[in-house]
């Protein structure tokens, strides 16, 4: 059974300015905390489209949302398919979309999913259990150069080369099959002094592998750009991120659409084509409250950004 504490639950939904008869999309259903809070504000004409690529999360959410099932459409899919999902449902535009990015607590807490560096499990890390690529495949078969690239780019790991070398040396002897086996190898690649600083030594490599397995950053970029086109004027998009890579990407996309195209010189009136598509509701990201942190230590790195559609 999933037990998941939603981060910044009220803020994420309240910033959407919920209309009681509106249509909303939850792109990351997870433990359904945000979904339940939103559904409690909708009347019988309101509707929620709830997306998750993890079928276990959807099965659990049906129980959590059992009093609201007549207003929820569950979709087992990657949120990068937003446009197609709405097309299949014959919906043109919605009133708001929200994302709660990162791994949900239950995925971390179920050892056999392979996300956690605290429990021994096979190297899996797939959000969608039907996809083929796993962490095992990356760790054992990707080249040294590819490993260095993902550890550095997705994990911001400064010892990427040393760790990739240790992985290479170990897998030449025999395949690396479990999470704790990988943790020990990562520790070998990090100098003893550095291992004692900055949290768990495997944290950054595990984050990098998870992002690579699930193609998280490019999926999010695809999705958020579609979301901007699928929300009605005055509708809003809320995004909670959990690490700097996601937050930077979200900020850059919102900034780009807020600027609009460059206006040619000498135009007496600025045509609508050159006006911004959206405005950022909060210039600086909203962070978790002390109350959030008391409930859920994973909220410490959470940042919320909100944009409102202008045209």
Curated annotation (Swiss-Prot):
UniProt superkingdom: Bacteria
SUPFAM superfamilies noted in UniProt: Putative methyltransferase TM0872, insert domain (SSF81799), S-adenosyl-L-methionine-dependent methyltransferases (SSF53335)
Reaction it catalyzes: cytidine(1402) in 16S rRNA + S-adenosyl-L-methionine = N(4)-methylcytidine(1402) in 16S rRNA + S-adenosyl-L-homocysteine + H(+)
Location within or outside the cell: Cytoplasm
Keyword flag Methyltransferase: yes
Record InterPro entries: RsmH, SAM-dep_MeTrfase_MraW_recog, SAM-dependent_MTases_sf
EC number: 2.1.1.199
Record's keyword terms, sorted: Cytoplasm, Methyltransferase, rRNA processing, S-adenosyl-L-methionine, Transferase
Full protein name: Ribosomal RNA small subunit methyltransferase H
Organism: Staphylococcus aureus (strain Newman)
């Amino acid at each position: 059974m999933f037990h998941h504490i939603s981060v910044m639950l009220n803020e994420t939904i309240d910033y959407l300015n919920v209309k009681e008869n509106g249509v909303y999309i939850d792109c990351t259903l997870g433990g359904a905390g945000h979904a339940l809070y939103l559904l409690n504000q909708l009347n019988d004409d309101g509707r929620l489209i709830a997306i998750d690529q993890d079928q276990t999360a959807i099965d659990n959410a049906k129980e959590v949302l059992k009093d609201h099932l007549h207003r929820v459409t569950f979709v087992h899919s990657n949120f990068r398919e937003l446009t197609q999902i709405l097309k299949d449902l014959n919906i043109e535009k919605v009133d708001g979309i929200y994302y709660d990015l990162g791994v949900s607590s239950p995925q971390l807490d179920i050892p056999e999913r392979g996300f956690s560096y605290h429990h021994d499990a096979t190297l899996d890390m797939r959000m969608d259990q039907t996809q083929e690529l796993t962490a095992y495949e990356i760790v054992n078969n990707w080249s040294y150069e590819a490993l260095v690239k993902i550890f550095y780019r997705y994990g911001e790991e400064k010892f990427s080369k040393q760790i990739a070398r240790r992985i290479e040396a170990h897998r030449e002897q025999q395949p690396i099959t479990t999470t704790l086996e990988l943790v020990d190898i990562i520790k070998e690649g990090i100098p003893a002094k550095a291992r004692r600083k900055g949290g768990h030594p495997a944290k950054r490599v595990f984050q990098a592998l998870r992002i690579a397995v699930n193609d998280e950053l490019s999926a999010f970029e695809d999705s958020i750009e579609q979301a901007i086109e699928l929300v009605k004027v005055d509708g809003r998009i809320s995004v909670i991120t959990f690490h700097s890579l996601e937050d930077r990407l979200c900020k850059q996309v919102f900034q780009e659409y807020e600027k609009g195209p460059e206006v040619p010189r000498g135009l007496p009136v600025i045509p609508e084509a050159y006006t911004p598509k959206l405005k950022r509701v909060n210039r600086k990201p909203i962070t978790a409250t002390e109350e959030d942190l008391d409930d859920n230590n994973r909220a410490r790195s959470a940042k919320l950004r909100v944009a409102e559609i202008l045209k």
